[in-house]
């Protein structure tokens, strides 16, 4: 079995600077508006292509069975869309992005897989040309293929490049795994009814996360704890990760030391580009 030299890729996390949920579509997805930026919190994926015609995926943590794994689904979609047969590859995933946190770890891994496959099999393809394929894998996969901070509409696949002023971000995550489906169907979800202009700057007074009310209703004790911290933590995606942005790294370090609950914490930077 001939093996090609292994190639490593980084797979970055994202945050939603705001997330407005609009109407439900006939395909079951919801239209939305959001502003994505990236974090220097990242997974590492190593791809070793070979002629085995087998797809093997391993990780440093427990991951979904092959048929339910977004990385595997990305490979199959790539095969079907571009008629690339007999893919043989060993993929090793080193996870650092927490799962079920709203940071897009699984979607990011799927996008990285599409890019690795493109680099090996179809290097003439641009990232933008793969966005329609990415959208078929999930609402967040497109932004990771796009690779730049962006305003997003549709289900997240209509993207407009929009930089965000780089800052530090303190992430905190309770030991809670969120069901996205449950949050979308929650009676506590109050959907946004008014579109806002993508030309606006970051405005906390009109830009919020519609899922925060759902989270706070389900986990009122965590909501109370955030109030006690007296800081403007915001939720990314459907949670359960919250973030606080600041240009002052020391301020965030001091706050992190003040947090006495058993929460996972990261101090990271925002990024406008990941490719």
Swiss-Prot record:
Give the GO biological process terms: isopentenyl diphosphate biosynthetic process, methylerythritol 4-phosphate pathway; terpenoid biosynthetic process
What is annotated as the active site?
14, 140
Recall the GO molecular function terms of this protein's record.
4-(cytidine 5'-diphospho)-2-C-methyl-D-erythritol kinase activity; ATP binding
| Catalytic reaction annotation | 4-CDP-2-C-methyl-D-erythritol + ATP = 4-CDP-2-C-methyl-D-erythritol 2-phosphate + ADP + H(+)
EC number of this enzyme: 2.7.1.148
Pathway membership, UniProt: Isoprenoid biosynthesis; isopentenyl diphosphate biosynthesis via DXP pathway; isopentenyl diphosphate from 1-deoxy-D-xylulose 5-phosphate: step 3/6
Q: Where does ATP bind?
A: 98-108
What are the alphabetically sorted keywords of the record? ATP-binding, Isoprene biosynthesis, Kinase, Nucleotide-binding, Transferase
**Signal peptide per UniProt:** none
| NCBIfam families with a match to the protein in the record | ispE
Q: Which family does it belong to?
A: Belongs to the GHMP kinase family. IspE subfamily.
Q: Main role? A: Catalyzes the phosphorylation of the position 2 hydroxy group of 4-diphosphocytidyl-2C-methyl-D-erythritol.
> What's the name of the protein?
4-diphosphocytidyl-2-C-methyl-D-erythritol kinase
Name of the coding gene: ispE
């Amino acid at each position: 079995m001939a093996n090609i030299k292994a190639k490593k890729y980084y797979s970055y996390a994202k945050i939603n600077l705001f997330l407005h949920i609009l109407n439900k579509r006939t395909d079951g997805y919801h239209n939305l508006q959001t502003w994505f930026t990236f974090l220097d919190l990242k997974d590492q994926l190593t791809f070793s292509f070979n002629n085995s015609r087998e797809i093997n995926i391993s990780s440093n943590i427990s991951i979904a069975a092959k048929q339910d794994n977004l990385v595997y689904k990305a490979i199959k979609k790539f095969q079907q869309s571009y008629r690339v047969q007999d893919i043989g590859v060993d993929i090793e995933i080193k996870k650092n992005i927490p799962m079920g946190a709203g940071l897009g770890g699984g979607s990011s891994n799927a996008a990285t897989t599409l890019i690795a496959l493109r680099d090996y099999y179809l290097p003439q393809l641009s990232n933008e040309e793969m966005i329609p394929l990415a959208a078929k894998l999930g609402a967040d996969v497109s932004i990771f293929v796009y690779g730049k901070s962006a305003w997003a509409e549709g289900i997240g696949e209509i993207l407009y490049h929009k930089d965000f002023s780089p800052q530090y971000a303190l992430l905190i995550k309770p030991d809670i795994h969120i069901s996205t489906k449950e949050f979308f169907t929650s009676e506590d979800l109050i959907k946004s009814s008014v579109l806002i202009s993508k030309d606006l700057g970051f405005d906390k007074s009109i830009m919020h996360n519609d899922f925060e009310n759902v989270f706070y209703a389900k986990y009122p004790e965590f909501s109370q704890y955030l109030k006690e911290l007296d800081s403007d933590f915001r939720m990314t995606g459907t949670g359960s990760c919250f973030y606080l942005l600041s240009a002052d790294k020391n301020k965030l370090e001091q706050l992190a030391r003040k947090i006495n609950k058993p929460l996972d914490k990261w101090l990271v930077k925002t990024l406008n580009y990941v490719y």
